[in-house]
């Protein structure tokens, strides 16, 4: 409720809740709970549902059922999806259902210490950080899959110039 109050104070009339919650929004019961709580606020609260069951990146949720119960789109926000075939299948289903997918784009195998972009500041403090390539490789994959499938996708929190150019 505090998020909705802050949104209303900032002039927002509609927000979309992300699905990376505990429990995750990977089933109708949780989705309906989020939407019911949203109805108690002064703004229009929508909710995304998860792309995969338990946000584990292994099995797609029942996207058709979740959309029928009010999911505005799908995401495993905060968790990058590593399986390209699964992402393609999710995109094909999203096209069929006419819903957007939103992706957290960073390849964890390329990151030594997350939380800061790798660059002069991170190197100065010996932190390491996330190289731009960790973001770029998943953005490239998902942009290409979206072009091939026709899916509507959102790339969350872009920080790499190369990623911006790919999205454009």
Feature-to-residue mapping (PLM):
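A glycine-rich helix N-cap at a beta->alpha junction
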Residues: 36-51
């Amino acid at each position: 409720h505090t998020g909705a109050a802050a949104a209303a104070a900032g002039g927002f009339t509609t927000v979309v809740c992300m699905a990376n919650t505990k429990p995750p929004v990977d089933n109708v019961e949780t989705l309906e709970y989020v939407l019911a709580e949203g109805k108690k606020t002064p703004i229009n609260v929508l909710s995304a549902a998860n792309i995969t069951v338990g946000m584990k990146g292994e099995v797609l949720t029942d996207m058709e059922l979740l959309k029928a119960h009010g999911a505005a789109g799908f995401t495993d926000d905060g968790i990058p999806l590593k399986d390209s075939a699964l992402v393609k299948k999710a995109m094909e289903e999203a096209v069929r259902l006419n819903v957007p997918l939103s992706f957290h784009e960073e390849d964890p195998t390329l990151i030594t210490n997350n939380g800061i972009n790798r660059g002069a500041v991170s190197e100065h403090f010996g932190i390491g950080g996330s190289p731009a390539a960790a973001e770029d490789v998943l953005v490239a994959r998902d942009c290409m899959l979206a072009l091939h499938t026709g899916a509507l996708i959102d790339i969350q929190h872009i920080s790499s110039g190369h990623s911006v150019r790919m999205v454009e």
